[in-house]
């Protein structure tokens, strides 16, 4: 079964298109846009995105590494990106998980609800597979290299994470199951651990 579900890079244009829009809307603070690509968006998420958008210039060099999801038309996506902070020269490489599925209207959307036990187990298992572990390690190494090359990067990231964590501390315990929740909250290596622990 695992051989039939190997990690594929940029294999589905429709997934790449959805993920690109998701990150474009997020960096722009466009909550209406996000609502068009997510199955739901909470008030807390809207507030977090609006508060952090001034620190974020954009997400660059996005690449989607996919495994098939639990159902036809669904995908577990490990998104590699380089997060460009405003006024910081060096982008921060990161890796975030998203779960994408086809809704009743036939459109691909980003799952943003409460994950089932089955989905949690599936994501956790996938995150420990060799191909994903190698991808996580590669992204973590790139992030460490970027941080070592630009001391301002780590400082700006701390500010960004504080904004995200301040607005999500109260909901962390209830939302830790949803794999995509990390995407906008945790750039760089923070995701490496959360892919493992959270879903």
Label the model's feature ranges.
Residues 31-35, 87-94, 108-112:
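Short, solvent-exposed secondary-structure capping/transition elements
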Residues 67, 96, 107-114, 130-133, ...:
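Short C-terminal domain-edge/linker segments immediately following a structured domain
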Residues 87-103, 119-122, 164-170:
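A short, terminal or domain-edge coil/loop segment
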């Amino acid at each position: 079964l695992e051989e039939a579900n190997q990690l594929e890079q940029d294999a589905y244009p429709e997934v790449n298109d959805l993920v690109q829009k998701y990150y474009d809307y997020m960096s722009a603070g466009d909550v209406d846009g996000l609502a068009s690509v997510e199955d739901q968006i909470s008030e807390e998420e809207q507030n977090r995105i609006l508060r952090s958008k001034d620190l974020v210039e954009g997400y660059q060099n996005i690449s989607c590494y996919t495994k098939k999801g639990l159902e036809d038309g669904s995908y577990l996506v490990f998104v590699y990106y380089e997060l460009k902070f405003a006024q910081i020269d060096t982008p921060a490489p990161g890796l975030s998980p998203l779960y994408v599925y086809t809704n009743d209207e036939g459109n691909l959307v980003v799952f943003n609800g409460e994950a089932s036990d089955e989905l949690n187990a599936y994501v956790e298992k996938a995150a420990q597979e060799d191909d994903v572990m190698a991808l996580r390690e590669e992204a973590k190494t790139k992030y460490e290299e970027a941080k070592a090359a630009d001391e301002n990067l780590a400082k700006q990231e701390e500010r960004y994470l504080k904004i995200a964590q301040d607005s999500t501390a109260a909901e962390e315990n209830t939302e830790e199951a949803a794999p995509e929740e990390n995407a906008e909250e945790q750039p760089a290596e923070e995701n490496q651990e959360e892919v493992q622990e959270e879903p």
